[in-house]
Amino acid sequence: MWNRLNKSMMFCQMMFGLSFYGVMVILTRFFLEDLNYNEADTMMVVGAFSAIGPLFAIAGGFIADKFLGAYRSLTIAFLGFASGYALLVLGAAATNVPMALCGIALASYARGLMSPSYPSLYKRTFKTQEDFENCYPINYSVNNIGALLGQYLFPMLVLVVGFHGGFLLSAALAGAALLMMLFVRKGLVEASAEIDQKPVSTKHWGAFLGLSSAMIGLVFFMFSNMDIGQNIVYAIGGAAIIYFVSLMMKSKKSDMLKMGTILIITFLTTCFFVYYGQMMTSMTMVAINTMRGDLFGFIPVAPEASMAMNPLWCMVAGPIITGIFSKLEKKNIHFSTATKVGFSFILTAIAFGILTMAVTTVGEDILIRPEVFLAIHFFLAFGEVIVGSMVVAFILSVAPKHIENFSVSLFSVAIALSGIVGAVFSTSIALEKGQEITQEIVQTVYGDYFQLLTILAVVMVGIAMAASFIIRKMLEAAKAAEETIELEQANS
């Protein structure tokens, strides 16, 4: 099951988690304090940084399928991360907004290359689909070890070395992942699809460079003009879904039904990640404004590092969830992916219910203890691990092989759309520059917002359970269609 190749890839995944989430956690204060952005604009930029990268997984999936292959795409992605973080170093040192935006634009595009390529290549390092499905949640936890350390340590690190020092460390970590990809190149290429084993033509390299330049320029424009940028995200996401539907309509009946289930699961994933996106935007802003004290009285936690509690619990959740579902399957108890997403919404409703209670009952000191955020992230993280690991495995299990990478990129489209929608929602609780936080603001503005999210999470539980029934019927119909074709071929 485990071998040198998938272990090496998990090292790269950890380096990604350390560097990317380390950058993300310090971006909020970097834009608020060094670049003098207000709360609303800061939440939009940080939300977009978490969202636009997955959006360009559309291009990443196309590039991996048609031009470069998964291995080359992933290797170039780590080069892009290292280069983007290096630009952030220069932007922070010179307090240069355009250079900083260019850095996060390049890192966002690199994430777009990585998102569809990593699971596709990682899957090929296992002998069976079952081994891959059982081990993918472990990989998710490895990513979260990196994310935990990055999100917890970077806020304290920048107090010593400054923002430019934090960005420099991220560049070095991304560089380490790049070196590892080069070190195990031979083994990964042998395990890869045929496209990775063939040389790339000059024409394809030129097309890749041209497309990449255009995409990076577009991302920079979107970060510089977020009002227009969010509409571009909606348009690109919508176009990707329309293109997928067009492919679905041209497919045979069995493939069409399977692709239809991917659309349903993409909708559920989008709704879930609207909640996940609050962690980087509204929940971080609430923590900065209200969270005070050490965790359990002795563990120092910077307010913006509260989101580090998420990967902490995700790291714990991965093996537990894998163990629970494996034991249930041995007892012949099987839940569909949509039903599992429904379980995630139950956990999400509990998490936001706790947050709603915390802000509506806050005292005159406007203080919320770190332990409250720890409890919130416990429930949210378990839901995230279910969606983050199970949905990708489901898509890979039903997607036609010739559009496998593009199908996986729909998962990233869901993250992108939800990230922007969630960031837009979050701006409703943003304070003006210099506005003082009060008990009334926390109880009413924050309270009403999180109460609405809690109610909607409960509604989504019912929708997910209904979707589970529909998906089951569609997959049964797809199987029947395949059997009919096989029977006709056998009789002809």
Regions found by a protein language model. Give the residues of each.
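Intracellular loop-helix junctions on the cytosolic face of multi-pass helical membrane proteins
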Residues: M1-R4, F154, V158-T284, I288-D294, ...
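Short amphipathic helix-loop junctions that connect adjacent transmembrane helices
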Residues: V25-D41, M279-A305
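Central cavity-lining transmembrane alpha-helices of secondary-active solute carriers
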Residues: G47-A64, A308-I321, L417
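Conserved MFS/SLC helix-loop-helix module at the cytosolic interface between two early adjacent transmembrane helices
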Residues: A57-A94
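Cytoplasmic membrane-interface "Motif A"-like loop-to-helix N-cap segments
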Residues: K66-L79, K327-I346
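C-terminal ends and interior cores of transmembrane alpha-helices
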Residues: L79-T95, F343-D365
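Intracellular juxtamembrane helix-capping segments at the cytosolic ends
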Residues: L113-K127, I386-A399
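Glycine-rich segments within core transmembrane alpha-helices of 12-TM secondary carriers
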Residues: E133-Y152, V158, L173-A177, M181, ...
